[in-house]
A protein has these predicted regions:
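N-terminal beta1-alpha1 cap of cysteine-dependent amidohydrolase-like domains
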Residues: 1-83, 87-99, 110-118, 154-157, ...
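Structural motif
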Residues: 19-20, 38-39, 78-81, 88, ...
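A short linear-motif detector with a strong N-terminal bias
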Residues: 18-21, 37, 59-60, 100-105, ...
Length: 270
């Protein structure tokens, strides 16, 4: 079902990390395996064929078999990213939005308002300065490709909590940064929400696919934009790698008085 694990691995490599594609069953069988990594990414695709609901079965795998290892991973200061189906997994497993009284059923992701699979490019506007994956204030242009991408909150109180506690990471906007209806908001997400972060700023989930825009030739109009075009998607991965190097590995190196150790990232696949 997962079908963007190779692109995600490639994006991490471009950003300077060593990435391993790890089957979720290996993590379940060896729960200490996760400890050797610094970034955990749940890639996009259709895990378990989207049976029941998109991301639901893998979310149940996480809830029943990996809740403690993943929680410890986050508590240790490491990073978690969920892309498209991976975002659905993080939400349905209760990892996002996370903390401060949120219940698993307060937020979910459901079918697009159009009733169709939406495959198009969209602009995203960052909504927070605390998420380590994000460059605050800079619009990014990336593709979406999903049939169930509509973020919904249980009620107005749950939505207000997302807003007031800084959980909204990205919103869908136009080229000028303004929110709007379809196709600007491709799925009808409440408050134009395209991505969420947790209270630490080290867990990010988003419906669009940054791993599909890490080379300039992947832009739909790349030939008109010149050789200096810096792909927007790769910045998310660079920021993650930079954070690990500057915050986690340098601290470890200082404690051991040795050189900066190598780090790696893992992407689980069903």
């Amino acid at each position: 079902g997962i079908n963007t694990d190779l692109e995600t691995e490639y994006a991490l490599a471009l950003a300077g990390a060593r990435a391993d594609r790890v089957h979720i069953n290996r993590l379940i069988e060896d729960k200490q395996l996760l400890e050797q990594y610094h970034i955990l990414i749940f890639p996009g695709g259709f895990s378990y064929g989207d049976d029941v609901a998109a991301g639901k079965i893998m979310a149940n795998q996480v809830i029943h078999h990996l809740a403690e290892p993943v929680r410890r991973f986050i508590d240790d200061g490491k990073l978690v990213l969920g892309i498209c189906n991976g975002f659905q997994v993080l939400v349905k497993a209760g990892i996002l939005p996370g903390g401060n009284g949120f219940k698993q059923e307060d937020v979910t992701i459901t079918g697009n308002d159009s009733g169709k699979y939406e495959d198009r490019w969209v602009y995203l506007a960052p909504q927070t300065t605390k998420c380590v994956f994000i460059d605050p204030g800079q619009l990014i242009y990336v593709p979406v490709a999903h049939g169930e991408g509509k973020v919904v909150a249980r009620d107005g109180q749950a939505l207000q909590k997302l807003q007031s506690e800084g959980h909204i990471a990205f919103k869908y906007v136009d080229a000028n940064g303004a929110e709007g209806p379809f196709p600007i908001n491709p799925n009808g997400s409440v408050d134009s929400i395209a991505g969420l972060t947790d209270t630490t700023g080290r867990v990010l989930g988003l419906m669009p696919h940054p791993e599909r825009y890490v080379r300039r030739t992947q832009h739909p109009h790349w030939s008109r934009l010149g050789p200096d075009l810096d792909p927007d998607g790769i910045r998310i991965f660079r920021n993650a790698v930079r954070y690990v190097r500057e915050t986690i590995l340098e601290s470890l190196a200082t404690q051991s008085s040795g050189g900066t150790p190598a780090f790696s990232a893992g992407t689980p696949e069903p």
